């Protein structure tokens, strides 16, 4: 029988399981330390203290290693741990947080005594004195100098980390992040000064060393250093001679071996530049060559060690340049490029774990703060501070950001920096990566090291995950608000004002820095939006900071803001509009990109606003892609058929066309559609409009008396020509057509033709009526005899004409002929008739081919518009659309009788057939294909950006950047887009010349 012992006789010592120890050897290690030999209260408290270490197993293992080290004085340490709560908290916390500092303690076992008693952080001067004393002792034995300095540096890190972490184990004071970061910077200064002294000794011996100032940059310069970080420096010498450079180089080597990596990459010309420059050389560089990012870097500059007078001269000379950098001509362009570069630095697979460069991370805060300092620092000296936390406070105090926002952003920034410190302490390695989401053990360790405790709903790891989500989201939201909320408060109604709001001049400076070329107009638009009465103004005030931030990344934020104002005013009565933008960030972000890129789409959206709701994502992907162009075409024809009045029928057709154009153009701008899909969708809707218009006019013109009452005197088919026939229409394309008719039984040809011509002319007139929508021009000039020929012919008339009189250009035009609307059977018969002309059994005559070559030469010489650049005209320029299409058509004329696959109206499909048949080498065909696709994308992009048909690419500037973005290139890469266009078309032109034999 088992007898339960009374409670007073049960062991008081907690088991390893209750302590949270999971290492299989934990119990053995406890016994090795003798901690299970006594069950008094002191040992109970000791064990529970160990359990509170961030990683108690790691702490226990380090203690065992320390106990096994002869010089550690374990008996003294073991006894002290039982009675000295502060020592216990510091030692357990640091051993449970940092494997590297545990290794240091084992290597320097007596260093635990640094954590004993009333420990405080030394001042900057006291640290410098410690390192100076160490150097004085070490120089007597130069071989050991850096070893001693390295040990001293690690000892001081140990003390700081222990004080920083102690509160996780015992009730010890919490060190503020700013104190930790400043002390790390002081420690770096002392270490650099020591390395400089040793370097001077190594290089100069007993000679007087050269005057050299070391300027700390980055986080060290701002006194906000990490536990593990490169220390960025710039060297300033009285003379930039060999000896001074050797001292600087030796200092970098010694410091990098003993303390931390020293990086001089921020110096003028970077790693390609001289390591040491004089003050005068620095001044000359920054006056002539420095980029905006280099002035931004100077915000953190601080004379750290070395010659103080030289350092002061350097700062006095260069800092005034920092505060006028925002007036530089290329400031805005470079700032926008820097913003985008920050976002592109992070590999996609770790973006969610990046605490520094990820979305809502540290760099978001730092970049935004530095930009606001550059913009407003010229007129406000209170912003001339180096650290991020101090700058946030100054920006809030000055009204450049809301004070509550400044406080929230500071809290988020300090939280993220705390996590960064804990991650780096673990192995004293430079890292910014959070643990993998499914690495429960690593997440739990980080939470405990950051002094995060369970909250009743989540364990520590769960609380950390929630807090990270909250802080990242808050930073992302405040990042946008940071730039724009104070602007709105400076122009908004009384209820939005802050006590010391931004002046209008400051608001204009800030908008200009964010990419707005007309900041005064932008402020007027913003004012009109937020000063609306009632709910709309309030919602706009909430929405605009985020919307304006997204829009600032578009190529034309000025045009985008105007379009947004017009759209908002046009949809003022639509309650869903602002709600959608508020509740669906993906919709709002995509809309801002479209509005800030295109002049074509905003007008369409004002009359087809429901397309905006399709900017979001559905279960299967983007909702803009859920619509089938063929279904749209059927719906358009059906909608028009419900009206007996042709005008109303076409109005109904225009409505559906407008919506489809808005959908296709939006999806195109957002990178969701390939250019070939765009062309097919545009062709589909054009064909549907032609069908609807033809049906409406036939209904309106049916005879109301006589034997043909209620019956059409003729069947009519519409033959698509050019890009319409090839299903390759762009946004600015006309519809090239021919009309063919066939008399109804009992109707003579002349009457049938007159009636069909009247219908065709009415179709052209009705569709061509000026409208707010993109034009619907129907061009019939490719018919036999061109403008001089009859608008409509019978099938027999066409056959007779082509058999007897067809000119080479008319044969060439027929290569693109395709039945698109009207009587399908008649259309097919027309194509069979046309095949005899365009694909004759024995091939086209040599005379016709020579004539085509002659016409092409004349087109090249004469048809380019006056003043056009032949290198960048997308239609008629070198290697443009006409070049590629004429080349394909010449090969069709020469070989279609031998290669049935060339009986095709599509340029791209014919190119595939040409390559398959070996008529042109495959690599050359690919050059033609790439040129056609490139020119088509560019031509479509021109219409999307400018809002009207045009073929000429603009020169370098904002509009070219917009065209590049609309064509699928990243923002600010207009130059690369143009270079690519020129390269692709130049190579294609060589193939064109080869085929044409010129």
Swiss-Prot record:
BP-aspect Gene Ontology terms: regulation of glutamine family amino acid metabolic process
Region (Adenylyl transferase): 492-998
Cofactor(s) for this UniProt protein: Mg(2+)
UniProt keyword list: ATP-binding, Magnesium, Multifunctional enzyme, Nucleotide-binding, Nucleotidyltransferase, Transferase
Function per UniProt: Involved in the regulation of glutamine synthetase GlnA, a key enzyme in the process to assimilate ammonia. When cellular nitrogen levels are high, the C-terminal adenylyl transferase (AT) inactivates GlnA by covalent transfer of an adenylyl group from ATP to specific tyrosine residue of GlnA, thus reducing its activity. Conversely, when nitrogen levels are low, the N-terminal adenylyl removase (AR) activates GlnA by removing the adenylyl group by phosphorolysis, increasing its activity.
PANTHER family per the UniProt record, alphabetical: BIFUNCTIONAL GLUTAMINE SYNTHETASE ADENYLYLTRANSFERASE_ADENYLYL-REMOVING ENZYME, GLUTAMINE SYNTHETASE ADENYLYLTRANSFERASE
Protein name: Bifunctional glutamine synthetase adenylyltransferase/adenylyl-removing enzyme
């Amino acid at each position: 029988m088992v007898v339960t012992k009374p409670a007073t006789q049960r062991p008081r010592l907690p088991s390893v399981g209750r302590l949270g120890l999971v290492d299989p050897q934990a119990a053995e290690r406890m016994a090795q330390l003798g901690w299970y030999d006594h069950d008094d209260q002191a040992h109970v408290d000791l064990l529970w203290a160990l359990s509170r270490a961030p990683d108690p197993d790691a702490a226990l293992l380090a203690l065992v290693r320390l106990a096994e080290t002869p010089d550690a004085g374990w008996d003294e340490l073991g006894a002290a741990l039982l009675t000295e709560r502060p020592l216990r908290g510091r030692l357990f916390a640091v051993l449970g947080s940092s494997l590297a500092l545990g290794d240091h303690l084992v290597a320097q076992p007596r260093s635990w005594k640094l954590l004993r008693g009333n420990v405080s952080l030394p001042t900057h001067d006291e640290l410098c004195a410690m390192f100076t004393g160490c150097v004085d002792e070490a120089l007597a034995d130069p071989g050991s100098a850096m070893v001693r300095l390295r040990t001293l540096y690690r000892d001081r890190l140990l003390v700081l980390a222990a004080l920083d972490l102690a509160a996780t184990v015992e009730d010890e004071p919490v060190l503020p992040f700013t104190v930790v970061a400043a002390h790390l910077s002081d420690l770096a200064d002392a270490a650099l000064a020591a390395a400089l002294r040793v370097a001077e000794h190594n290089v100069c011996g007993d000679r007087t060393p050269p005057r050299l100032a070391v300027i700390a940059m980055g986080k060290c310069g701002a006194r906000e250093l990490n536990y593990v970080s490169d220390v960025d420096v710039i060297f300033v010498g009285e003379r930039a001679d060999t000896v001074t450079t050797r001292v600087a180089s030796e200092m970098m080597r010694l410091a990098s071996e003993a303390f931390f990596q020293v990086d001089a990459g921020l110096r003028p010309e970077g790693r390609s530049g001289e390591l040491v420059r004089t003050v005068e050389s620095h001044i000359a560089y920054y006056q002539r060559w420095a980029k905006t990012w280099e002035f931004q870097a100077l915000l953190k500059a601080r004379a750290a060690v070395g010659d103080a007078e030289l350092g002061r001269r350097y700062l006095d000379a260069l800092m005034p340049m920092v505060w006028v950098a925002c007036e530089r001509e290329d400031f805005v362009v470079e700032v926008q490029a820097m913003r985008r570069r920050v976002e592109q630095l992070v590999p996609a697979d770790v973006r969610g774990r990046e605490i520094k460069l990820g979305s809502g991370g540290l760099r978001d805060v730092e970049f935004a703060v530095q930009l606001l300092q550059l913009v407003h620092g010229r007129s406000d000296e209170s912003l001339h501070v180096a650290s991020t936390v101090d700058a946030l406070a100054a920006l809030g105090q000055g009204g450049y950001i809301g004070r509550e926002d400044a406080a929230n952003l500071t809290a988020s920034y300090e939280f993220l920096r705390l996590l960064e410190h804990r991650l780096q302490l673990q192995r004293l390695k430079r890292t910014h990566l959070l643990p993998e989401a499914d690495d429960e053990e690593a997440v739990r360790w980080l939470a405990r090291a950051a002094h995060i405790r369970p909250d009743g709903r989540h364990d520590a790891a769960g609380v950390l995950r929630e807090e990270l989500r909250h802080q990242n989201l808050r930073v992302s939201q405040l990042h946008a608000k940071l730039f724009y909320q104070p602007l709105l408060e400076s122009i908004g109604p009384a209820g939005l004002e802050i006590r010391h709001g931004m002046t209008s001049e400051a608001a204009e400076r800030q908008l200009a820095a964010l990419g707005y070329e007309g900041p005064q107009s932008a402020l007027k638009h913003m004012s009109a939006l937020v000063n609306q009465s009632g709910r709309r103004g309030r919602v706009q005030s909430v929405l605009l900071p985020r919307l304006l931030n997204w829009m600032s990344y578009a190529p034309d934020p000025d045009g985008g803001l105007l379009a947004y104002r017009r759209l908002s005013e046009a949809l003022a009565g639509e309650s869903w509009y602002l709600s959608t933008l508020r509740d669906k960030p993906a919709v709002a972000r995509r809309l801002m990109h479209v509005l800030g890129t295109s002049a074509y789409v905003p007008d369409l959206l004002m009359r087809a606003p429901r397309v905006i709701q399709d900017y979001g994502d559905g279960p299967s992907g983007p909702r803009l892609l859920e619509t089938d162009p063929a279904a749209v075409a059927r719906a358009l024809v059906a909608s028009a058929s419900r009206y007996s009045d042709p005008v109303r029928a076409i109005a109904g057709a225009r409505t559906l066309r407008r919506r489809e154009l808005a959908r296709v153009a939006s999806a195109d701008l957002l990178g969701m559609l390939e250019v070939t899909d765009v062309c097919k969708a545009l062709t589909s809707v054009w064909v549907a409009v032609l069908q609807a218009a033809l049906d409406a006019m036939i209904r309106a013109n049916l005879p109301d008396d006589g034997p043909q009452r209620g019956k059409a005197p003729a069947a009519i088919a519409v033959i698509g020509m050019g890009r319409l026939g090839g299903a390759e229409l762009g946004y600015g394309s006309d519809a090239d057509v021919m009309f063919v008719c066939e008399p109804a039984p009992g109707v003579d040809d002349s009457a049938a033709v007159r009636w069909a011509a009247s219908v065709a002319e009415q179709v052209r007139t009705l569709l061509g009526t000026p409208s707010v929508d993109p034009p619907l021009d129907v061009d019939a000039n490719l018919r036999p005899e061109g403008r001089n020929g009859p608008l409509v012919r019978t099938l027999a008339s066409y056959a007779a004409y082509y058999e007897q009189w067809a000119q080479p250009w008319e044969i060439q035009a027929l290569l693109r002929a395709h039945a698109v609307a009207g009587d399908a059977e008649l259309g097919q018969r027309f194509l069979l008739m046309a095949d005899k002309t365009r694909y004759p059994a024995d091939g086209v005559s040599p005379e016709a081919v020579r004539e085509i070559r002659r016409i092409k030469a004349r087109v090249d010489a004469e048809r380019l518009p006056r003043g056009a650049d032949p290198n960048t005209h997308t239609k008629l320029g070198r290697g443009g659309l006409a070049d590629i299409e004429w080349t394909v058509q010449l090969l069709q004329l020469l070989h279609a009788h031998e290669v049935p696959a060339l009986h095709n109206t599509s340029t791209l499909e014919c190119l595939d057939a040409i390559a398959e048949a070996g008529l042109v080498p495959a690599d050359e065909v690919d050059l033609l294909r790439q040129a056609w696709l490139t020119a088509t994308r560019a031509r479509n992009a021109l219409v999307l950006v400018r809002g009207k048909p045009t073929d000429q690419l603009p020169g370098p500037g904002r509009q070219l950047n917009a065209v590049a973005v609309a064509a699928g290139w990243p923002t600010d890469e207009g130059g690369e887009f143009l270079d690519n266009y020129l390269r692709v078309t130049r190579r294609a032109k060589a193939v064109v010349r080869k085929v044409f034999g010129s």
